Structures are given as C-alpha cells and as structure tokens.
Amino acid sequence: ALRQTIHPLNAAPLLTLINEQEKTLMKDLEKKHLADCREDFMRRRNTRDRRDVAECRKRLDAFLELWPDSAERETVAKVRDFLNVIQGGVKGKLSVVKGKINKETTYDKPDVFVTVSQGNKELLHTKMIKDNWYPEFNEGVDITWTVDMPPLTFKAIDVDPVMDDELFTHHEESLGFDGYKGLSKTITDTGCELFIEFKPNTPIPDCPWLK
C-alpha cells in the first residue's frame, strides 16, 4: 500500500530507501537466525542424547530452506551433512595398536594382553605379547559409535603364574558430536601408554563449527 501511494508521486529516492531498509532488515534476520543455529549447536555439542543431533539438523535444514542465497550456505550445509552422518551412528573398526609398559609397574618384561569392554561385555581380548615393554597388538573389533555410546574400558593385563597383574585401566567416554575422535589417541594410566585407533567404514565429513 505504501509503495502504491508513493509511486504516483514518482518518489524514486524514497522507494530506493525503502528497498535498502528491507534488505538490511532481511540481512539482520538472517544473521540472527544463523547465530541462533550456531548457539544451539554449541550448546548441544557435548550431548549424550541422539535427539540433540536430530534437533540441530532440523534447525539447519530450516535455515538452508529459508535463506537459499545466504553467503553462509556452504558452511551451514557442511555442518548439516556432518550431523546427517553421525545421527544414526558411525560403523567402523576400533583397534588396539600398540603399548608402552612402565618398567616400574613390573619386575621383568611383561607377558601382556589387552581387553576392551563395555559394561560387563568384553568386546576384544587381544593375543598375549610375551617379554616386551613395547607390545604391538594391531587387533581390533567392529563397533558402531554413537553420541550415546556407553563408556569403553581398556585394560592391560600382565600374565603371571601366581596372579595376573592389572597394569593399566582407562575409561573412555566418547560422548558428543565429535566423541569418535576420542577413540583415536594415546591413552595413559600408571605411566603406561596404549595407542588406540577408530577407523570409520565411510569417511566422516569435516564440521566447520567443531574446528
């Protein structure tokens, strides 16, 4: 109605001003929408609830639909694609690669094996490596990582004729949007080290908001 009133007066400068104000308003709304999406993502990133992944993804889908010409479209799409991949869980192989035994924890070179368990369920029991401070295992188990996956327990056991010695115990809680990264690192306990590695069956796309 305002445009129809102005047009007969040939008030081109005023129409230009209105157009510029509309563009500014829309940019501000887009900026606020993006900020809300990012804030929601950061608030949920350490979640242990898969529903948080779905809620974040829905928000980003709505942003991409509402602002198809956004300068941030590519970034938002990458975040959305990342959430799509992790929402249902990521299948891959969790491996116990190698270890380093603290010489102060045992009298002589240990005969050591490693177990990986989840609650009361043993997922992996490696072969025993004899007489070695630096055992190499290179054994793994297929798992599905999810944001709500229960903690994993890693133990290194020194086999002894009288009584086995527990040299190492580590509980790994791989929660949150990027919790899978916690399954590829060197874990430590009592001066001992164990290198573990998680290799997804399909690549997980980079997430710009987690860098």
Question: Predicted segment positions?
Answer:
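Short solvent-exposed coil/turn linkers within tandem alpha-helical repeat scaffolds
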Residues: 2-25, 50, 61-79, 131, ...
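Compositionally biased low-complexity segments at domain edges in trafficked proteins
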Residues: 184-211
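Peripheral membrane lipid-binding modules
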Residues: 103-191
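C2/C2-like lipid-binding beta-sandwich modules
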Residues: 81-113, 202-211
